[in-house]
A protein has these predicted regions:
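Hydrophobic (often cysteine-bearing) scaffold residues that line and stabilize catalytic clefts
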Residues: 2, 6-9, 32, 53, ...
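C-terminal catalytic core of Y-nucleophile DNA break-rejoin enzymes
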Residues: 155-174, 180-200
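N-terminal DNA-binding recognition helix of tyrosine site-specific recombinases/integrases
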Residues: 9-19, 45-80, 130, 200
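Conserved tyrosine-mediated DNA breakage-rejoining catalytic core shared by Y-recombinases
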Residues: 89, 98, 134-173
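Basic/aromatic-enriched alpha-helical hairpins
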Residues: 1-47
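Short, basic (Lys/Arg/His-rich) helix/loop patches that form interaction surfaces
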Residues: 108-109, 178-188, 196-233
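Short, charged phosphate-coordinating catalytic segments
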Residues: 66-77, 122-145, 232
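Basic, Lys/Arg- and aromatic-enriched nucleic-acid-binding interface segment
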Residues: 51, 55-59, 74, 78-129, ...
Length: 233
């Protein structure tokens, strides 16, 4: 959280000073706009930080500087004239190319692979995390049309919803058959664990959109259903 971010920024500054200024420390009065811009450049060029990460770190530094100013240790604002803003990543869904990238990406271990597969399952079914977690095998039914369907009550809304399974989710169900307990379809890790791993996977795939189940469901409504000719109700 916040503490970790502050510690990371302090560590980056400790590396930045000898790297850029060939010194271990710097008096507060020497902080100026050049220092701020040099530090930003260091984060981008040396630490390979992305725009939004850089923005987050600079906010932390700005806060540290404002504490020094409020304490009377710094008579001026070195951030005056500094401009930086986050990249807009409010698209909130994945494109078809991104879905394919995600499905093709090699995962570093079985847990990452499971979390990726569950996310993809949500992308193709529109189910929330809690619905994927609570999905049991008795909810899977083959109808007269020969298709496999999920017959389920959505936990959030308590409404019944029937979802026809496309090939991708069918393959994912097959892959984890018999690995979950108590009649569940999937052995689902905790929500916190999934979020942490999804963040990792998103970074690995180079996505700007942060992977969350909200994004998975939005992707289902915008990218998947439209490309498979399913009307959005």
């Amino acid at each position: 959280g916040t503490f970790t971010r502050y510690r990371t920024v302090c560590n980056h500054i400790r590396e930045f000073l000898p790297h850029t200024y060939k010194r271990e420390d710097i008096p507060l009065k020497e902080l100026n706009l050049t220092f701020i811009n040099d530090f930003e450049y260091f984060l981008r060029a040396e630490k390979k930080c992305r725009t939004n990460t850089v923005w987050g770190y600079m906010i932390v530094l700005k806060h540290i500087v404002s504490i020094a100013r409020n304490n009377g240790r710094l008579p001026f604002n070195p951030f005056a004239g500094y401009i930086n803003s986050p990249e807009s990543v409010d698209r909130g869904y994945l494109t078809q190319t991104e879905i394919q990238t995600l499905m093709d990406a090699p995962m570093k271990n079985a847990t990452h692979e499971l979390v990726r597969d569950l996310f993809v399952f949500s992308v193709f079914t529109g189910l929330a995390y809690s619905d994927v977690k609570n999905l049991t095998t008795d909810r899977l039914q083959t109808f007269f049309d020969g298709n496999l369907w999920i017959i389920t009550r959505r936990k959030k809304t308590n409404t019944e919803s029937n979802i026809r399974l496309l090939d991708v989710p069918k393959r994912i169900i097959e892959k984890y058959k018999g690995l979950a307990r108590n009649g569940h379809v999937f052995p689902v890790p905790s929500n916190g664990s999934c979020n942490k791993i999804l963040k990792d996977i998103g970074r690995q795939c180079g996505f700007k959109v942060r992977l969350t189940y909200h994004v998975a469901r939005h992707t289902n409504a915008t990218t998947v259903l439209l490309s498979h000719g399913v009307p959005i109700e």
